[in-house]
């Protein structure tokens, strides 16, 4: 709450400098890094999926709260990744779909600008003891293209697959893939690649959960609890 108020005050000023912005970022990471923690091992659970269902608590039945109440650590890839993904798509369109070089140049410039904005945050996270900086969008694309074509650009497209692989590499192999009922892009690049992900990463523990006004909340809860039971078993095995 303290840093929320500080950030609101900073961003509502007439002028915001990058120096002050990065200073606040470093201070936020430092303070969170110094919070005393209990010596408790929890399974890390990544959350991916359709952009609205993923980030809006009311749309995913407050999934983060549920996971934390069940004793797990929720891991959420950032929203900036989706913006970078939208810009990165221009390179595939230029190389294979006849899009203009000008469009690719503009979008690559946008990527550089967005990366410049979050450079301070990534550096602070990299230097921290507890946090992992996000990968570049090019790194995420390279992870995804082994399983799906980068031409999958409808909705979250290849980003969804790339985020799941990135989560597995970062120790969050337990993943909930949130999707609206009958969302075709998600079924292809989310649910559709789970089998291949399990083949490539045997330790992966992934479930796809449909969120829809007509969907049974009990079924959602049962699937998530079953995944968490497997996650806890895997955690116990790794500690022995």
What spans do the regions from the language model cover?
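An N-terminal assembly and electron-transfer interface module characteristic of large anaerobic redox
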Residues: 1-240
């Amino acid at each position: 709450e303290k840093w929320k108020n500080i950030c609101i005050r900073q961003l509502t000023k007439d002028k915001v400098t990058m120096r002050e912005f990065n200073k606040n970022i470093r201070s936020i990471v430092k303070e969170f890094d110094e919070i005393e923690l209990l010596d408790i091992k929890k399974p890390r659970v990544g959350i991916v999926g359709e952009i609205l269902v993923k980030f809006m608590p009311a749309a995913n039945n407050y999934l983060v709260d549920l996971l934390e109440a069940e004793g797990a650590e929720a891991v959420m890839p950032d929203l900036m990744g989706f913006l970078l993904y939208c810009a990165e798509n221009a390179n595939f369109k230029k190389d294979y779909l006849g899009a203009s070089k000008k469009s690719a140049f503009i979008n690559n410039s946008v990527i550089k600008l967005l990366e410049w904005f979050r450079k301070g945050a990534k550096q602070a996270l990299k230097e921290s003891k507890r946090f992992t900086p996000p990968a570049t969008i090019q790194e995420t694309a390279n992870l995804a293209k082994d399983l799906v074509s980068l031409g999958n650009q409808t909705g979250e497209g290849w980003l969804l697959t790339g985020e799941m692989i990135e989560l597995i590499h970062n120790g969050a192999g337990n993943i909930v893939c949130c999707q609206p009922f009958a969302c075709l892009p998600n079924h292809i690049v989310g649910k559709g690649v789970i089998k291949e992900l399990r083949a490539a990463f045997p330790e992966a523990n992934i479930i796809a959960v449909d969120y829809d006004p007509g969907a049974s909340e009990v079924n959602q809860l049962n699937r998530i609890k079953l995944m968490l039971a497997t996650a806890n078993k895997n955690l116990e095995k790794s500690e022995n």
